[in-house]
């Protein structure tokens, strides 16, 4: 769920559930609250030339393989303000036994989740793209 702090506080009082955990995040990512920043990001992306990727890319907005630079720009914009389709993304990746997933970023949260879902797939985590050679 995403919403204002006040709305989420009200909801947590009104519903009965086992656990209601508010995430400490810097923005309402992957929700309609990101529509305006997403539009600005889209304008920024129009100025950048994307090369054809060396390998297909999967976004959480549309969990399918994509190699089209223009479509990748659209997916980057759309995943800012749409829900994460994590299970579908993991299911797609599970179909490829030769897959090597690399999480690029400061934490290993996603690679940890992936290891639980994808038992036979190689998964690595690096802090920056500088650590990758292909």
Describe the residue ranges of each PLM region.
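Acyl-group transfer acyltransferase/transacylase scaffold of fatty acid/polyketide systems
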Residues: 1-134
């Amino acid at each position: 769920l995403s919403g204002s702090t006040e709305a989420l506080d009200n909801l947590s009082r009104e519903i009965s559930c086992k656990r209601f955990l508010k995430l400490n995040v810097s923005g309402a990512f992957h929700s309609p609250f990101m529509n305006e920043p997403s539009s600005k990001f889209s304008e920024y992306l129009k100025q950048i030339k994307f090369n054809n990727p060396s390998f297909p890319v999967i976004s959480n907005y549309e969990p399918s393989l994509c190699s089209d630079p223009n479509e990748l720009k659209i997916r980057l914009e759309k995943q800012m303000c749409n829900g994460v389709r994590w299970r579908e993304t993991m299911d797609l990746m599970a179909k490829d036994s030769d897959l090597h997933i690399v999480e690029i970023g400061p934490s290993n949260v996603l690679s940890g989740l992936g290891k639980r879902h994808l038992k036979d797939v190689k998964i690595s985590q690096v802090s920056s793209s500088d650590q990758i050679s292909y």
